[in-house]
């Protein structure tokens, strides 16, 4: 599946952020929880047959593969399959892991075709 350039840029920015955040840390691994939004019975936004849950799962798996190349980072996934996980459980996964960073990936959709860009909450 081909992704717009902004998805690729987002992955690069997140990778750089995590790389810089781990620089100079103690010997403890930096724990990142990757959360692919929606899943299972919750498709998220849709356009034709394309569902948000599928796109964000692909993005999270690609990002995780990149992050796992850094031996100082432990990657924890809230889901690796198309399953529904309650929001509270997603938070529990991060809290139990004592994660340093929680990244929840979504692809918002609007009917207004002039709307463009991304949003990030830290």
Language model regions located:
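Short linear recognition/processing motifs and adjacent strand/loop elements at protein termini
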Residues: 2, 23-26
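Bacterial N-terminal signal peptides that target proteins for export
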Residues: 2-11
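Short intrinsically disordered, low-complexity coil segments enriched in acidic
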Residues: 10, 14-15, 59
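Hydrophobic h-region of N-terminal signal peptides that target proteins for export
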Residues: 15-24
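Catalytic-core regions of hydrolytic enzymes
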Residues: 25-122
């Amino acid at each position: 599946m081909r992704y717009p350039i902004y998805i690729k840029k987002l992955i690069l920015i997140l990778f750089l952020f995590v790389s810089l955040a781990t620089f100079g840390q103690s010997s403890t691994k930096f724990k990142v929880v990757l959360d692919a939004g929606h899943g299972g019975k919750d498709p998220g936004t849709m356009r034709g047959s394309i569902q948000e849950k599928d796109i964000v799962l692909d993005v999270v798996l690609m990002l995780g593969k990149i992050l796992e190349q850094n031996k100082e980072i432990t990657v924890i996934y809230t889901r690796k399959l198309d399953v529904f996980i309650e929001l509270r459980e997603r938070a529990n996964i991060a809290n139990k892991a004592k994660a340093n960073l929680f990244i929840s990936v979504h692809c918002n959709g609007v009917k207004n075709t002039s709307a463009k860009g991304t949003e990030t909450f830290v």
